[in-house]
Amino acid sequence: EQPIATLSEATLRQSISVVPQRVHLFSATLRDNLLLAAPHAGDDALAAMLCRVGLDKLLEDDGLNAWLGEGGRQLSGGELRRLAIARALLHDAPLMLLDEPTEGLDATTESQMLELISDVMRNKTVLMVTHRLRGLSRFDQIIVMDNGQIIEQGNHADLLARQGRYYQFKQRL
């Protein structure tokens, strides 16, 4: 283990997968949009990941050669979000940072994506920022913040038992 400040940019990029709140779609092929995260991935791995995130319909016409973005197929917000999750999972880093990864997804798709992330990232570190409480029982540690301050932390069961802010949020659902 070494301090993060001593790591090179290349090492940091290799070590971290990110699902940003604002996902960028490049005007390029579907393949190119995925290879950004995993440059050496084969077509089978790319197609399999698209299927895992529920985007297999993107493969129907031109497959991985389908043009996305300007001059090509536009993606809905939910499709864009799932493409970002596919990129992050393909990157296969030991640390994943997620910023509102399921924003705009319906409840069923949100549950599927959180289950997939949990499965693929087993024994790895996931840091997720969210305002939604669905799926948090899968996490080992939950930190509840208010105005930039930590007000509670623990696992799902502990936080419910304390009947604090997390419990109050859950009661409102």
Task: List the predicted regions and their residue ranges.
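ABC ATPase NBD Q-loop/coupling interface
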Residues: 1-11
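Conserved "ABC signature" C-loop
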Residues: 23-67, 116, 165-168
